[in-house]
Each structure stands twice: as structure tokens, then as C-alpha cells.
Design a protein with these regions (language model features):
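Membrane-embedded transmembrane alpha-helical bundles that form the catalytic cores
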Residues: 1-221
């Protein structure tokens, strides 16, 4: 979206700042969908009093803001529960868990990835019952086996894309590129390589669009 906006002369701020590198849900929501979080903070959370109120009122503010965030995505129970789930997680972190997560970064990363994954399932579920069936199956309690021939086939087929996505979800490529640019004699070579890489990515995206089936925009259903 930032690149597309730049094509038309608009300078959009960064909206996602490596959220999967977060070590807490609190940090995750400072990095994920920054513009949405800022809007709810400025126009709902702060007018309600924010955190400068009594504890009971502050808890109420958190729940109301996150229930509204879920409702913003869609008028269905799974979206409301999705928002309330994050409200509970944020309150638990602010109450006592956050200092522990800051000291144990690996545990914090696993904590984030686990609950974000659960949140995505809840977000995309057609109903609460559908969400529960998916969760049961994910943990081996349903009829779907955790490992099948089909799942191994897809894992093998898309291993390269998955690895690229994992690396791209971290700031490592940007940091490496910045260090290489500082070295003498490499800037011109990197500029040419960047153009070639962007052209290759454009062609790859077009190839996927041509080969893939029609997939309507997610928010059209809300």
C-alpha cells in the first residue's frame, strides 16, 4: 500500500513494523496496523479517560475499545470475541506478565505467535462453532490428522516461499542492505540489483495472479 500510494504521489506512513518480531501482545499491537490502533487510541480510548482513571474504569475502557475494534471488522460474534480476547491478553500483560516477557524474549515471541495464530483462526472463522472445530483439529482432537501426505506435499512445494516470508518478516534484510550500502563501491551495484529484484518480484506477482483463482477482497464481506 505504501508503494502504491507513492506511485500516485501520496506519502503513507509505515503501518506494519515487523509485528512478528514482538515479544509481547502489547508490543505486537504497537507494530501491527498502526493507523487503526492510533485512531482508536485518539478518538475512543483517550476521550474515555485512557489510563488516567480508576482501575475499574480503566479496565472498562480497555474492554470497550477492543470490543469496538472487533466490531469495526464485522458485526459477528467471532469478531467481538476476537477483540475481547486481545483485551484480556493486554490486561494480563499489564497486570503482571509484561516484566517476565521482557526478561525472557524467546518465551515472549512464542507467546505472541501462539495467541496471534489463535486470533487469526477466530478472526477468519465463519462462526464461533467453526472456530472451535478448527482449534480442536489444530491440536489433534478432531478428525483431521496433524500430519498428512497432503500437508507434507504443500510444505515441500511452498518451502521456498515460506522461508522467504519468514526472513522478510524480520528487519534483517533491511539492516543488511543498509550495511552494504555504506561500503565503498557497492552502492551503484546495489541500486542496479534493487531494480532487477523489483522487476522480478513484479513478474512473480503477475504470474501468481494469472495462475491463481479469484479471491475477493477480505473486507468486502463486512
Amino acid at each position: 500500500a505504501v508503494g502504491l500510494g507513492a506511485v500516485f504521489g501520496f506519502d503513507f506512513p509505515e503501518n506494519f513494523r515487523y509485528p512478528y518480531c514482538s515479544a509481547s501482545i502489547t508490543e505486537f499491537w504497537r507494530r501491527w496496523h498502526i493507523s487503526l490502533g492510533a485512531w482508536f487510541r485518539d478518538y475512543l480510548y483517550i476521550p474515555l479517560g485512557g489510563s488516567h482513571v480508576k482501575p475499574v474504569r480503566w479496565i472498562f475502557n480497555i474492554f470497550l475499545v477492543w470490543m469496538a475494534t472487533g466490531f469495526w471488522h464485522g458485526a459477528a460474534w467471532n469478531f467481538i470475541l476476537w477483540g475481547l480476547m486481545y483485551a484480556v491478553l493486554l490486561l494480563i500483560e499489564k497486570a503482571w506478565l509484561l516484566p517476565y516477557l521482557k526478561k525472557h524474549k524467546i518465551v515472549g515471541h512464542l507467546h505472541v505467535l501462539f495467541f496471534v495464530l489463535i486470533g487469526f483462526v477466530l478472526f477468519d472463522a465463519s462462526s464461533v462453532a467453526d472456530f472451535w472445530d478448527c482449534i480442536v483439529s489444530m491440536f489433534g482432537g478432531g478428525q483431521i490428522k496433524p500430519v498428512t501426505t497432503e500437508s507434507l506435499y504443500y510444505l515441500k512445494s511452498y518451502a521456498g516461499i515460506i522461508l522467504t516470508a519468514v526472513i522478510g518478516a524480520t528487519p534483517l534484510p533491511v539492516r543488511l542492505y543498509g550495511r552494504l550500502q555504506k561500503k565503498k563501491g557497492l552502492k551503484q551495484t546495489l541500486d542496479i540489483a534493487e531494480i532487477l529484484l523489483l522487476v522480478m518480484l513484479l513478474l512473480l506477482c503477475v504470474a501468481f495472479l494469472v495462475d491463481g483463482s479469484f479471491n475477493p477482497f477480505l473486507y468486502f464481506r463486512f
